C-alpha cells in the first residue's frame, strides 16, 4: 500500500540471475521521493524520463502526441526511479537506502 513496485526477480532457465546494472523501482510520487532522497544524501536518477514514442528522434512517426495509445509505458516512465547500486555499496548503506525509502513512503 505504499505505492512502491520493486523489480521482479526471475531466474533464467540456465540458472542465471539478474546482475542489476541499474536497480529501478516504480513509485507513484517519484519526483517527490527523488527530492527527499537527495536531501537525505541518497543518490537516485531518472534514466529514461520519456517513452520511446515521446522522444524527438521518433517524432516523424506521429506518435508523440497520443500518450493514450501507450498508457502503461507512460505510467512506467513517470514512476521509474533508479537507486544506488554498485559493487562497493555496503550492506549498511543498502539498509539505509531501504529504511529511508520505507520511512519516506509512510
Locations of regions flagged by a protein language model:
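PLP-dependent aminotransferase class I/II
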Residues: 1-106
